[in-house]
Amino acid sequence: MEQAPNMAEPRGPVDHGVQIRFITEPVSGAEMGTLRRGGRRPAKDARASTYGVAVRVQGIAGQPFVVLNSGEKGGDSFGVQIKGANDQGASGALSSDLELPENPYSQVKGFPAPSQSSTSDEEPGAYWNGKLLRSHSQASLAGPGPVDPSNRSNSMLELAPKVASPGSTIDTAPLSSVDSLINKFDSQLGGQARGRTGRRTRMLPPEQRKRSKSLDSRLPRDTFEERERQSTNHWTSSTKYDNHVGTSKQPAQSQNLSPLSGFSRSRQTQDWVLQSFEEPRRSAQDPTMLQFKSTPDLLRDQQEAAPPGSVDHMKATIYGILREGSSESETSVRRKVSLVLEKMQPLVMVSSGSTKAVAGQGELTRKVEELQRKLDEEVKKRQKLEPSQVGLERQLEEKTEECSRLQELLERRKGEAQQSNKELQNMKRLLDQGEDLRHGLETQVMELQNKLKHVQGPEPAKEVLLKDLLETRELLEEVLEGKQRVEEQLRLRERELTALKGALKEEVASRDQEVEHVRQQYQRDTEQLRRSMQDATQDHAVLEAERQKMSALVRGLQRELEETSEETGHWQSMFQKNKEDLRATKQELLQLRMEKEEMEEELGEKIEVLQRELEQARASAGDTRQVEVLKKELLRTQEELKELQAERQSQEVAGRHRDRELEKQLAVLRVEADRGRELEEQNLQLQKTLQQLRQDCEEASKAKMVAEAEATVLGQRRAAVETTLRETQEENDEFRRRILGLEQQLKETRGLVDGGEAVEARLRDKLQRLEAEKQQLEEALNASQEEEGSLAAAKRALEARLEEAQRGLARLGQEQQTLNRALEEEGKQREVLRRGKAELEEQKRLLDRTVDRLNKELEKIGEDSKQALQQLQAQLEDYKEKARREVADAQRQAKDWASEAEKTSGGLSRLQDEIQRLRQALQASQAERDTARLDKELLAQRLQGLEQEAENKKRSQDDRARQLKGLEEKVSRLETELDEEKNTVELLTDRVNRGRDQVDQLRTELMQERSARQDLECDKISLERQNKDLKTRLASSEGFQKPSASLSQLESQNQLLQERLQAEEREKTVLQSTNRKLERKVKELSIQIEDERQHVNDQKDQLSLRVKALKRQVDEAEEEIERLDGLRKKAQREVEEQHEVNEQLQARIKSLEKDSWRKASRSAAESALKNEGLSSDEEFDSVYDPSSIASLLTESNLQTSSC
């Protein structure tokens, strides 16, 4: 459409060529009105009865003009001009002029603009409404009726899509003259005039010989002659295309038909040829390739062209048209015909290839756009994940600061422990001093007895007194022997405890060695598993099996959650029982206090009675010397009693100080327990952060191009957080071990204090028992918390193992279930032990030691379970690393797929370039068929490479299957190791049963001790009776006897009794103080138990929430796996589509080769029929009738659709 204004300008002489005009019969106004293209009506008035053929030959200078008709200037004529490679919008390729100008070279308005600008059928605005014109649509060529011109234009545009050409491709060459051609015609015929009689004398100025000065100004001046050569080439090719129109006029004249019918058939032939072949040839070919050889002399140009052969009917028709009205030789006309047909062949080949290339190019551009959009989405996702990195680093810094603070607190605790050790040594020294004093008092008592023996006389009263003294001494000895027996029993129990400690330590060491060996073996196995599982993620069947196993694992986690809830209920019931036990001990302490007060009252009364008796004895004594001696002895004994009382008071003060220290240490233990809870809360926070990290990982897994780097960073951060968690757990364990050491030291100090008196020892033992119970409760709470933490860690690890192999997940689930069962059995055993402890509450001295021993055994069992859980955690961490590596491998594979897609896109672009080169080569000549073959070989090589890659992938899948079999064997071996662990747990249960038997034995011993206590109380009562008897005897003897040596003996007995009373008072005070302390401790323990129960409930709620979160994350992980599987399938489909595109390209190359071979064979066959000279109009019509043209067009369409 851009050329329409240019064609409307005044035109000078055009290029070399021939213009053929048909002079028609008069037709109706309606019919002739439709023949206009530019809106003008032909002038039919002056030449209503003229007809014939007018041939106009244009010379070198544009002067000669030959017309073969009736001699009149006007007349309906149709000019056909066929050009070579021209711009898309050139409408002058086919021209029909309804008026023959008088002399187109003498005036500027020789060719009317409408006629020149509207004759091309390629213009969308062109139309034909004549009754005898056939449609130009290739789909309706076989049809009889006319069709809408819009359909004709659109079909032509669809057959040969227009490609926009730059402005430089417009034919801007000046119209050179053809004087040389006309002069040559004149010289060959001996100066005989051709066409019109007169030579045109008027010469056009040079500026009118150009089409457009504005267009010529685009090119430099030095290309002017080159454009002249091109313009001559256009006119030469134009003439060869359109010369067949003339012969269709002859049968119209002979049969008295409308002259438009023959024209319509010739116009149809011209239209489908030009519409389907000229447009792609202009857009695809380089003008340099289609620059035909042209010279100013048309005859010499025709002689140099070698005809490749064409259809004989067309050749005859064009030959007749060129021959009529011309005086040229027969050889020159035949050369023109062959040249016209030669230019039509490459256009036929170009038409089929252009539509295929455009379709393939559109598909490739769509794929490139889709890949670019995916890349942009991945970049955006990566930018979203970057802010989470800063928060994780900040959390790691906070955790390191907390670890440093905990280390400082540990150092302070060490200093406090050393100070407590020093205080315990001081207390031990004081106890030794008290023992020395006791031995001194016993020696003094012995001396007094010896003195009494010397003073003894034959009187019967003295003998009675001696007997009483002997009896009292025997009783005292029996009491001392009972005390020694009790102390020996205590020493035996302590030795047994030390022996049990050593055995437990040895067993713990052996257990640690076994666990270390198993851990090393497991690390080696897991390393091999990690190496073997790196390439297993592409297997579809394995992914499906893993998904099913993960659903089963979620159900197992739910069962574990129910078991943990049952365990928490069990712990609550235990806490309630312990609380009841503490209440019972409190009642017992109150009862003891009341008994002690009663004993103090009785002793006070006895002391008052003895003092009154002594005063009476002094008043009645006659011998002053004996009285003085007795007074001195009494003073000495009173001073010794005062010293003993002072020592007792100092010991009591030391005991109070020790009790305060114990309370401080208990407070420290509470602080440590609170700190442990804080650490557990921090662990929960860390678990929350880990859950957030997992969510980030799930979001990062959606980014195929970026997920590898993100996964490695998240893995490192997760490992750092897990190391911090492990460090905090280790610190907690170390704190607990140190607390246990301190408590053992406290027990040793209590054992030293037990060497004083039996009552004080019993009370201290009871205190130890209560503290041991508290410790047991704390340890039970810590064990439950650790078990909950281990369960949470196991769940977290199991969540991370969603992407691991199926058998590894099943094995870990079984191991965890077995450990949970072992923990349940241990809990049951603990419950049985606590029931035994409830039965042994009344046992004062031996029960607490047996309970301590059992607690130590339970601690060992808990440590074994902790070690097993730590081993599981290490295994889970290894599996986490393996999962991260698998994710990294999957991301690398995704990148490989993306790179393959980019390579395929690059390969497609290269294939497009090759297709373009192949099209140009096919348009240029058959010689470029070798390059197409080379391209075909390259494509075959690429297909072979892709097939080899597929085979390599299959081999890698087979290798992965073998590796999975090896993994199954390793899993079976680990299961056997788990069975061994079960056996060790059974051994531990047997050991606990043995401890239970020992508890029963200690119970019997406690009953024996109780019976001994009752015997001692009976002895005490008997001694009191004897004392009363002695008092009565002393009163009766004082009435009728003088004071004698027996008085001193009685006074010594009184002193002994006073000492015993004082000892009883001191014991009473100690009991009261210890009872008060025990009451306070019982209250504190009850409060602590309530707090711990609340904490356990909170942990239970947190566990339930965490399990729900784990379920949700498992579902999300399954969805992510399905999404990745879909992406992988999509990538495979794209690769398969690329294979199909390659196969289509190969098929297209083969079809093009077949077409070229077919056309070569056809040209060879037609060259054989070249000399037959078929010139009849009927034969031409039989070859170019609508049915044959439709068959040709449908054949080209079939070729296009097959590509």
From Swiss-Prot:
<comment type="function">
    <text>Probably plays a role in the formation and regulation of the tight junction (TJ) paracellular permeability barrier.</text>
</comment>
<keyword id="KW-0175">Coiled coil</keyword>
<feature type="region of interest" description="Head">
    <location>
        <begin position="7"/>
        <end position="357"/>
    </location>
</feature>
<feature type="modified residue" description="Phosphothreonine">
    <location>
        <position position="712"/>
    </location>
</feature>
<dbReference type="GO" id="GO:0005886">
    <property type="term" value="C:plasma membrane"/>
</dbReference>
<dbReference type="GO" id="GO:0003779">
    <property type="term" value="F:actin binding"/>
</dbReference>
<feature type="region of interest" description="Disordered">
    <location>
        <begin position="89"/>
        <end position="127"/>
    </location>
</feature>
<feature type="modified residue" description="Phosphoserine">
    <location>
        <position position="137"/>
    </location>
</feature>
<dbReference type="GO" id="GO:0045296">
    <property type="term" value="F:cadherin binding"/>
</dbReference>
<feature type="modified residue" description="Phosphoserine">
    <location>
        <position position="155"/>
    </location>
</feature>
<feature type="modified residue" description="Phosphoserine">
    <location>
        <position position="351"/>
    </location>
</feature>
<dbReference type="GO" id="GO:0000226">
    <property type="term" value="P:microtubule cytoskeleton organization"/>
</dbReference>
<feature type="coiled-coil region">
    <location>
        <begin position="358"/>
        <end position="1160"/>
    </location>
</feature>
<feature type="modified residue" description="Phosphoserine">
    <location>
        <position position="1176"/>
    </location>
</feature>
<feature type="region of interest" description="Tail">
    <location>
        <begin position="1161"/>
        <end position="1203"/>
    </location>
</feature>
<feature type="modified residue" description="Phosphoserine">
    <location>
        <position position="338"/>
    </location>
</feature>
<feature type="modified residue" description="N6-acetyllysine">
    <location>
        <position position="579"/>
    </location>
</feature>
<keyword id="KW-0796">Tight junction</keyword>
<feature type="region of interest" description="Disordered">
    <location>
        <begin position="186"/>
        <end position="266"/>
    </location>
</feature>
<feature type="modified residue" description="Phosphoserine">
    <location>
        <position position="276"/>
    </location>
</feature>
<feature type="region of interest" description="Disordered">
    <location>
        <begin position="1154"/>
        <end position="1181"/>
    </location>
</feature>
<feature type="modified residue" description="Phosphoserine">
    <location>
        <position position="165"/>
    </location>
</feature>
<feature type="region of interest" description="Disordered">
    <location>
        <begin position="1034"/>
        <end position="1053"/>
    </location>
</feature>
<feature type="modified residue" description="Phosphoserine">
    <location>
        <position position="214"/>
    </location>
</feature>
<comment type="subunit">
    <text>Homodimer. Interacts with TJP1/ZO1. Interacts with SPEF1.</text>
</comment>
<feature type="modified residue" description="Phosphoserine">
    <location>
        <position position="96"/>
    </location>
</feature>
<feature type="modified residue" description="Phosphoserine">
    <location>
        <position position="140"/>
    </location>
</feature>
<dbReference type="GO" id="GO:0016459">
    <property type="term" value="C:myosin complex"/>
</dbReference>
<dbReference type="GO" id="GO:0008017">
    <property type="term" value="F:microtubule binding"/>
</dbReference>
<feature type="modified residue" description="Phosphoserine">
    <location>
        <position position="1182"/>
    </location>
</feature>
<dbReference type="GO" id="GO:0030054">
    <property type="term" value="C:cell junction"/>
</dbReference>
<dbReference type="Pfam" id="PF01576">
    <property type="entry name" value="Myosin_tail_1"/>
</dbReference>
<feature type="compositionally biased region" description="Polar residues">
    <location>
        <begin position="232"/>
        <end position="266"/>
    </location>
</feature>
<feature type="region of interest" description="Interaction with TJP1/ZO1">
    <location>
        <begin position="54"/>
        <end position="67"/>
    </location>
</feature>
<keyword id="KW-0965">Cell junction</keyword>
<feature type="modified residue" description="Phosphoserine">
    <location>
        <position position="95"/>
    </location>
</feature>
<feature type="modified residue" description="Phosphoserine">
    <location>
        <position position="217"/>
    </location>
</feature>
<keyword id="KW-0007">Acetylation</keyword>
<feature type="region of interest" description="Disordered">
    <location>
        <begin position="25"/>
        <end position="48"/>
    </location>
</feature>
<feature type="compositionally biased region" description="Basic and acidic residues">
    <location>
        <begin position="207"/>
        <end position="231"/>
    </location>
</feature>
<keyword id="KW-0597">Phosphoprotein</keyword>
<feature type="modified residue" description="Phosphoserine">
    <location>
        <position position="135"/>
    </location>
</feature>
